[in-house]
């Protein structure tokens, strides 16, 4: 079982945790057990389930194509990981936070029956229109999924998603509930026991909070921003609390966006961003820092019921 209930802690951060990092875009609290999270929650209950197609502007489409889906090898690798554990032909797969739908499109080509959840109007519209996919703008915790699709899917995936949700334990329980017995839950997410987070902690401490470096790129109090970063141990405990047997947990190197995206979060000057880009590119070619983790869990017969109240 989880040593602490992170969802309960997040509802009362000042009572159950202490403020440790005051960042440019977020206040990061740390619980007694070590959970790191911001005090911001997305207004999910105010989001309409209808997809507003007018939000898919040319600028938004360009962002999806040149930034969000720029690393095509990343999506191909995700297909490879899933196919290692599950024959894709006719498999029912749900991707939570499916973005522009590229992964679902690739899975569909392999014969999978795919469905996506995306709460961003522009991304949901892009995935539905450009890839002709079934996309729903309803959170996994809603009755639509919990009552209509309980025990339905062979696999549920959350790629770079669990760090964005309001209540991660509730999200994982809800995802486990829509899995068949023996079904798979696959997650990748930034890892707190990594070089970047540790360096950020050190520079913040040594500078008295003036130079958080990587921490500024890892947490955000903006809509759908990073609300929590987990350690590998915490993620393993969360899976276990949801009745999921961890069959794979590994750290690996991956950048979800182009180098420029991260440099802009670290450096305020466009000139410095352009100056540092070639050095950063060379650095990552030499050193594959394991900044993320992949966790694969299999649903056992005894699963904790999802509490979506």
Give residue spans per PLM region:
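Surface-exposed loop/turn positions
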Residues: 91, 182-183
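A short linear boundary/processing microfeature
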Residues: 130-133, 181, 205
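Conserved N-terminal segment of class I S-adenosyl-L-methionine
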Residues: 1-159, 169-172, 251-254, 260-264, ...
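S-adenosyl-L-methionine-dependent methyltransferase catalytic module, highlighting the catalytic core
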Residues: 166-177, 184-303
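A short His-aromatic
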Residues: 160, 164
